[in-house]
Amino acid sequence: MSFRTLDGLDVRGRRVLVRLDLNVPMRDGRVSDLTRIERQAPTVRELAEGGARVIVMSHFDRPKGKRVQEMSLRPIAEALGAALGQPVAFVDDCIGGTVEEAVAGMKDGDVLVLENTRFHAAEEKNDPEFSRLLASLAEVYVNDAFSAAHRAHASTHGVTAHLPAYAGRLMQREVEALELALGSPTRPVAAIVGGAKVSTKLDLLGNLSTKVDVLVIGGAMANTFLAAQGIKVGKSLQEAEMHDTARAILETAKKAGCEILLPVDAVTATEFRADPPTRTVSINEIPDDAMMLDVGPETVRLLTERLSGVKTLVWNGPLGAFEISPFDKATVALAQSVAGLTETAGLVSVAGGGDTVAALKHAGVVERLTYVSAAGGAFLEWMEGKELPGVAVLRA
């Protein structure tokens, strides 16, 4: 996919409207995780150092079109300033006379953060007039919010009807990484899909089963696939109503030449809590009173062996209930194997989704994979094969 980037763009003296995703975790009025801000700061810094007058806009949380003080971007603007290492101004609206005055007073290299765009109901409606008012503040539009690109809102989509639109550096990295993984990948391609429910990842499984060579199914959704094939999974979380669907996915994959890998052994317990008594058993020997809470060591060994023969890997979702010890072991072990293959065998490894990022952080391998996306819904929709409105408008 060809899209417009900041390469060669002269921004000196120009007003640049930058859409960031500043929807970050907060605790006691302070930003508790700076990852998303730090990933987007380079785009703002590059524009400011290039002499642009940078006007930042973003949503935060779900105020439903009303002004909610706890959802103000003011404290987040301060965190952005700290990440940039320069003062950042803030204005308590995103359209109107006060905002226009603040923009008119900007000098080259200044950064101004507008108030939460979702304080206006028109934002999520992609309202044309609201889009026009936002766009009227600037001469150029830059979108660096890949994680919000699956929404056709005024600040991600509507404004592009009025301004030339470019991808910021994080947006560029995200799209290029995903193109590398699923657009035109080096084969063989494998995908790991974990998580609790088949029902929430139907589109994803359907798309991947026709695009990848190897599909690894883990997490609680593996229980549903196993049960659909007549394997007794005890008291494990599973969706009985999805058995026909699971069998259909297996059949589709078979016709497409996609190899599906399911667990061959399981770590089981009779209660879901930290450090309970556990048993590791063959997948055919799960006790009636037990739950499968992680895949076993033989599954990890087989997966590591199979992945050593692929060139590209996409990962969404943990293999087990990684947030509770000891059911993190398989995810951590496989993550470390994937990191090793990335470093020594040239594996292109791209991962994303909230739980996935948390699991990879827990395993200490985020920096060792080719790319780890902090985007949740947008990453998932891209993997489902859907076009993202906020990316489509950046096409060259």
UniProtKB/Swiss-Prot annotation:
Give yes or no: UniProt keyword Mitochondrion.
no
Name the EC number(s).
2.7.2.3
* Catalyzed reactions per annotation: (2R)-3-phosphoglycerate + ATP = (2R)-3-phospho-glyceroyl phosphate + ADP
Cross-referenced InterPro entries? Phosphoglycerate_kinase (IPR001576), Phosphoglycerate_kinase_CS (IPR015911), Phosphoglycerate_kinase_N (IPR015824), Phosphoglycerate_kinase_sf (IPR036043)
Q: Could you confirm whether the keyword Cytoplasm appears in this record?
A: yes
List GO BP terms, alphabetically.
gluconeogenesis; glycolytic process
Q: What class of enzyme is it?
A: transferase
Q: Name one GO cellular component term.
A: cytosol
Instruction: Provide the protein's localization.
Output: Cytoplasm
Q: Which PROSITE patterns match?
A: PGLYCERATE_KINASE (PS00111)
Q: Where does ATP bind?
A: K201, E323, G353, G354, D355, T356
Binding, substrate: D21, L22, N23, R36, H59, F60, D61, R62, R118, R151
**Keywords assigned by UniProt, alphabetized:** ATP-binding, Cytoplasm, Glycolysis, Kinase, Nucleotide-binding, Transferase
GO MF terms on file? Answer: ADP binding; ATP binding; phosphoglycerate kinase activity
* Pfam family, any one: PGK
Family per record:
Belongs to the phosphoglycerate kinase family.
According to the record's subunit comment, the protein's assembly and interactions are: Monomer.
- Write down what this protein is called: Phosphoglycerate kinase
Q: List the source organism.
A: Granulibacter bethesdensis (strain ATCC BAA-1260 / CGDNIH1)
